[in-house]
Amino acid sequence: MALVRLLGVECRNALQRSYSTASVPTTKMFIDGKFVDSKTTEWIDLHDPATNKVVTRVPKCTQDEMESAVESSKKAFKTWSQTSILGRQQVMFKLQHLIRNNMSELAKNITKEQGKTLVDAEGDVLRGLQVVEHCCSITSLQMGETVPNIAKDMDTYSYTLPLGVTAGICPFNFPAMIPLWMFPVAITCGNTSIIKPSERVPGATMMLMELLNEAGCPPGVVNVIHGAHDAVNFICDNPTIKAVSFVGSDQAGKYIYERAGRNGKRVQSNMGAKNHGVIMADANKENTLNQLAGAAFGAAGQRCMALSTAVFVGEAKQWIPDLVERARKLKVNAGHVPGTDVGPVISPQSKQRINELVESGVKEGAKLVLDGRSIKVENFENGNFVGPTILTDVSTNMKCYTEEIFGPVLVCLTVDTVDEAVEMINNNPYGNGTAIFTTNGATARKFVNEIDVGQVGVNVPIPVPLPMFSFTGSRGSFMGDCHFYGKQGVKFYTQTKTVTQLWREGDVSHTKAAVAMPTMK
């Protein structure tokens, strides 16, 4: 049933019948093109972050269920890898159309399970959709290379081939975007894919599977399993799985990279961040303050590219009171409420950790100029809400600076020169993203050239590249050789075969008859 034909609650209920059990709200698996109930005895309750009411129960899939997903993917690879690249491209054409037409329903599910505002949830879907759109150019992206006449009568050419069964392990903060970073690139290159969405937000992935079926993707090309630590270990250890993509925390990312790597798998692992925004006194003040507030507090700060650290250079520190006032005016509420700027964080545990890191800053000497920890939201008193929070007079040895807070908290530092700002950022172990706000081109150029961070914005607070490029976080924020999506994404999901062939000119058959007098030479 096409999602586009369904509206409101009717759509939500219809979808639930597809991937959940209506009487007891339990999320299903997706194996061999079908939504399947798990036989597990272990379940994880998924709570609405705005109310903490249980939305659904997510299974910890059994060993047999995970094995069946791998077998399905292994079987499908035999035919899918031999499917015309034009046929694989057609699936992406259809999928991008279906996602675009059902963006609103996907966003509603994301807001319900993850908590972010509806506008932000639509952005979540859109940034994933852009990867699908880029996959539609696979006929160019997957081209090989040729050198004719590398020697007498000899040609060399190379072409890219799929790896086999691949897997993706997804985080909670982007329920649609991150799965769409993974399985579309993998399967368009001819692989099959097993996706493990975060047990906190599986709904968007399940809806995408329904759309993938409608797009005509054959059974087994993508399978979805659920679970926590055991599911991760299964993916890392199973010998059939050739490559693993991960986005999430430092601890999990390092663990997956090392464990899967020991088992001979390719791994790409996007991990933690501490993204700095450098504010020069010559910047456009109004635009800069608006961008700072949006990048720091949007999505309740639960973005790997959130601008969580502001570095004010010279007289720019005089702008801090104005920034505080902008942050104070942001509306905190449930994500589905119109006009909401900041929704809840994902869980009570996340809220507690955020509050503790803020308190650690205060104890270590930072000034709490805006405190959102005690905010109460009418009609949602049980929600996981933290309002915009700003700490000033922060130093680089404080825990609130050294650790990724992952909440609506901005820590502010001051320096005298752009050189000091560059040194500070380069000394931080993370390298996901950074930005500078200035109207001076020479300052911007110096910053771009000297900064050791993978993604740099100039008057752009969250410099996440579009999919014709790649997501190029570096240093402590990434482990692996090839980044997500773009040309590097295609390289990650393919292997190169190089052929050197020799065909002697003298061996050509059916040549023109020779009628000249034989000379015996």
Swiss-Prot record:
It is found in: Mitochondrion. Pfam families: Aldedh. It catalyses: 2-methyl-3-oxopropanoate + NAD(+) + CoA + H2O = propanoyl-CoA + hydrogencarbonate + NADH + H(+); 3-oxopropanoate + NAD(+) + CoA + H2O = hydrogencarbonate + acetyl-CoA + NADH + H(+). NAD(+) binds at residues 172, 196, 199-200, 249, 404. InterPro entries: Ald_DH/histidinol_DH, Ald_DH_C, Ald_DH_CS_CYS, Ald_DH_N, Aldehyde_DH_dom, MeMal-semiAld_DH. GO terms for cellular component: mitochondrion. Keywords: Mitochondrion, NAD, Oxidoreductase, Transit peptide. The active site is at 304 (nucleophile). Its EC number is 1.2.1.27. Gene3D superfamilies: Aldehyde Dehydrogenase, Chain A, domain 1, Aldehyde Dehydrogenase, Chain A, domain 2. One of its GO terms (biological process) is thymine metabolic process. One of its GO terms (molecular function) is methylmalonate-semialdehyde dehydrogenase (acylating, NAD) activity. CDD domains: ALDH_F6_MMSDH. Probable malonate and methylmalonate semialdehyde dehydrogenase involved in the catabolism of valine, thymine, and compounds catabolized by way of beta-alanine, including uracil and cytidine. Belongs to the aldehyde dehydrogenase family. Homotetramer. This is Probable methylmalonate-semialdehyde/malonate-semialdehyde dehydrogenase [acylating], mitochondrial. It comes from Aedes aegypti. The lineage of its organism: Eukaryota, Metazoa, Ecdysozoa, Arthropoda, Hexapoda.
